[in-house]
Amino acid sequence: CVCTNQDGQTVIRGTAEVLAPTEKIKRARIELPEVTLLDREARYQHLLARTKGLAAIPMAVVHPCDRESLLGVVEATQAGLIVPTLIGPEAKIRSVAEQQGIDLAGIAIIDVEHSHAAAARAVALVREGKAEALMKGSLHTDELMSEVVGINGLRTARRISHVFLADVPTYPKPLLITDAAINVAPD
């Protein structure tokens, strides 16, 4: 027996021994549970509608070396939300895109060696006014934040904050969470 996940990767492999009953077994028919299919995109249409008429913002995407980061970039670009600049090891970014069938045509890439360098270059782009926002890719949050709050980063005399959107299928609305791991004890 082989069981695979949604990406076709083997997660369990082994042998199953089936012991068939010697006598016929009858079981009462059970009522199946109700199945609900959620349209995840529909949950965000009201937020996307509020962006209509706004210009796409220049976005520095830091170390997008995984499928999710690249798909997010492409979808946000196609929706007219961002004009991305990918910052990271170009060969690795292009390899992931090719393996996942993601088209990066027309998207700028700044080739840097590793995630620390990507964070530093992305922060510099914002500081120089060449990007208006940062998007975290496949690097640790502390790598990005150490550049953001560093002496040559983006910090000011004001408090820094952030927000992330959690898609909770059992909650009827998008859930916005602020200050996770940034302001651990806000007043």
Regions found by a protein language model. Give the residues of each.
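Anion-binding alpha/beta catalytic cores of soluble intermediary-metabolism enzymes, centered on
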Residues: 39-85, 89-187
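HotDog/MaoC-like acyl-thioester-processing domains
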Residues: 1-38
